Amino acid sequence: MSVVIGAMGFALLALTVLPAPALAYSMVAVIETQTQGPLACGNTARGLEGTQTLLGISDEILLPSAEGAGGGDPGGALQVRPVVVIKELDRCTPPLFLALVNRERIRLVEIRLFDRQGVHFFTIRLEDALVARISRQVRSHGLHEEVAFTYRAIQLIDERSGASASHQF
């Protein structure tokens, strides 16, 4: 049994841990709270200064079926799950923790997705949000935390075509 050490080993680990489609994208978030103001999250990449680098995101909005699983007419209210971002522990960890424990309103969470060439192609914008949950995990490839945001309004923007859709809950 051999142990691979160094950058090449990390690259191989990243390739085996992340699904192929995830490797094609990068993501950052701009976060502005009501009392703390814009969070300076430490990204130093040119044009992305102060943003939060993300490792992943997930969200879900469901329209339940009136007849339960398996079909039928849609019935009932939309079921909206929090948007969850995965990030490393960093300088934005304490302000997000304070936002959670103080129930601080978050004016804006703007998630920007970039393709493999670094072109900003999609934006998810949350307004009037709250940090609903923070969970931390220690894994073999590092320390990460999941931050779940509930929100009043969401906007989806295709930056290439200009198409957008929004909804208030």
Short names for language-model regions:
Residues 21-169:
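Glycine-rich, low-complexity intrinsically disordered segments
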